[in-house]
Amino acid sequence: MAKFSALCSLALLGLATAQKPVGTETHEKLTTFRCTVAGGCVEKTNYIVLDSITGHRIYQPAAETLDCGARGAAPNVTACPTKEACAENCAMEGRTDYGSQGVSTDGASLRLQILHDGKKVAPRVYLLDETEAKYEMLRLTGNEFAFEVTMDKLPCGMNSALYLSEMEEDGGKSELNPGGAPWGTGYCDAQCYVTPFINGEGNIKGNGACCAEMDIWEANSRATHIAPHPCSKPGLYLCEGDECGSTGVCDKSGCAWNPNRIAQPHYYGNNDTFKVDTLKPMTVVTQFPTDASGKLAAIRRLYVQGGVVIKAETVHKAGLPEVDALTDPFCEAFGSQRYMALGATGGMGDALARGMVLVMSIWWDETGGNMQWLDGIASGSGPCNATEGAPANIPLVEPNPEVTFSNLKWGEIGSTFQGGARRL
């Protein structure tokens, strides 16, 4: 396992200049690949950084037992009456051992565990570029992205997520956030969540942090889901009131492609009777082809398992077009009204062309929904009953839920994978 440390300084800490440095931040090194049809894949070096809020201790140095706020609300009003005071009064402690947060790398593999010594850690991490100073910006319109995944330890209720967020390349680095990307700041997505800090600065007004989100992979061993989530505003947008809601600036639901929801229950599952057997490692390929004008026209999925390419099946369900990829006609027929209203596939492609940050995480649902939207019988999304995906029940089935993402590759369509005869 390769790890790289940088001594925290006032310029790297992510705090105002009056704040003292607090230790070191150690990034995990990860080998990735850039690919072309003519030249094949070239090895590159990237780094992994934990999210600033969920992966670090943020506290008040003047009263170290006190934090500076919780997810879902503006920051602590005593510590953060203003952004400037918030930067002065709140410290973020560096992480020297990502393993304690369920994160480890080995060459081209990234392992994420939801539990560490029996305690929930649910890590969310971002991909830094080779300098460790900013995020790697992926521009996938007209290209494809591939990765290998081992996920046999993800039962009902788990979610291994690999997706893109239109975060800022520098993580919102500023006078009040001199740390930026190396400290995992700047997260946003189409759910427009309220967090104590946005772009590393105190979120005094309690805004939501909105931006386009491309869910390439949300999955466990029982169900999988692709969902683009376009927004009407480019980049990070601070929403207020109704702008943050279900009819606001971002498509919260997205247009989902889940084999179970399109009458293909035999396609993906946890034994060898399924076309894609989740108990075995697989390569997941997602393609983003364009039309003649250069606009994103579709989002296409295929798998490679055992040296065999497994294409997406053509939809044969009443009311839906007979397509084998996520397209505007599919999304419109599926009832994805906000998706269509907020730019649809072309709008998602615009965000992908501008550049997005790669996010990877593992989590379970503690809101009471038990991840039924992803894998539940009631929602038509999978084979899981209403209670087996409850966080209290998951460790009874699998004591150590985890996922390993390996060999991340992106480049020209057709350049990231190899396989034998297609299996339909």
Curated annotation (Swiss-Prot):
GO cellular component, one term: extracellular region
Glycosylation site list: N76, N271, N385
UniProt superkingdom: Eukaryota
Subcellular location: Secreted
Positions annotated as active site in the UniProt record: E213 (nucleophile), E218 (proton donor)
The entry's keywords: Carbohydrate metabolism, Cellulose degradation, Disulfide bond, Glycoprotein, Glycosidase, Hydrolase, Polysaccharide degradation, Secreted, Signal
Gene Ontology terms for molecular function: cellulase activity
UniProt signal peptide: 1-18
EC identifiers of the protein: 3.2.1.4
One GO biological process term: cellulose catabolic process
Main localization (coarse): secreted
Broad EC category: hydrolase
Catalytic activity entry: Endohydrolysis of (1->4)-beta-D-glucosidic linkages in cellulose, lichenin and cereal beta-D-glucans
Induction: Expression is increased at 72 hour of infection, and then the expression level drops back to the lower level for the remainder of the time course.
Disulfide links within the chain: C35-C41, C68-C90, C80-C86, C156-C384, C188-C211, C192-C210, C231-C250, C239-C244, C255-C331
Family of this protein: Belongs to the glycosyl hydrolase 7 (cellulase C) family.
Other information: The biological conversion of cellulose to glucose generally requires three types of hydrolytic enzymes: (1) Endoglucanases which cut internal beta-1,4-glucosidic bonds; (2) Exocellobiohydrolases that cut the disaccharide cellobiose from the non-reducing end of the cellulose polymer chain; (3) Beta-1,4-glucosidases which hydrolyze the cellobiose and other short cello-oligosaccharides to glucose.
Quaternary assembly: Monomer.
Described function: Endoglucanase that is involved in the biological conversion of cellulose to glucose. Hydrolyzes internal beta-1,4-glucosidic bonds.
Protein name: Endoglucanase 1
Gene: egl1
